[in-house]
Amino acid sequence: MDAVIARYIDTEMEAAQAIADNPQMSAEEKMFRILRASGQDNARGDRLEKEASAVGNADMQQRTMASIVLRLSPILEGIVRQGMREGIFQTEYPRECMEILLAASEFMLHGGAFAWEGAQRLQKIKALAWMAEKALGAKKGHFNYLYEKFEKDGENCD
């Protein structure tokens, strides 16, 4: 199972890096694409998440979350630094902010430690978007796309 999860994470990180390396995209577009892609439901990712967070797999789930945080934060840090040059972000701690935001997201929303229902989960996602704006010095509403799809479509955000 570890090898399957590692391959899945490798694929996700390669996709994120390809977006980050695109010189034609603004930091805003890169961040949007990576964060929206990571929030998309897909059968394989959902199955792996459920197996990794099953009872008895806590160690595997913790290693998976740590791997995602450690591998995705430098990619997002580069995008934050680009955004700082473009004037959309302003922070003294781009790497640390991304590590903390990713860790919170992974643990609170994907770790299986909490059984948030749709409305509760939506509130957590809204709070995370608000925190990201504050931590990265972005304008109010900058990260609303993290939850607008669920609000607009009335979708379940489980």
Name these PLM-found stretches.
Residues 3, 7, 14-48, 98-101:
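Hydrophobic alpha-helical connector segments
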Residues 11, 41-46, 83, 108-111:
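A short secondary-structure junction motif
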Residues 19, 23, 49-53, 112-116:
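Secondary-structure edge/capping motif, primarily at the C-terminal ends of alpha-helices
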Residues 23, 27, 90, 94, ...:
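Residue-level recognition of alpha-helical structural elements
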Residues 44-78, 85-89:
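Short secondary-structure transition hinges
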Residues 71-105, 112-116:
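Hydrophobic alpha-helical bundle segments that form small-molecule/ligand-binding pockets
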Residues 74, 78-86, 115-158:
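C-terminal peripheral helix-coil segments that are non-catalytic and often amphipathic
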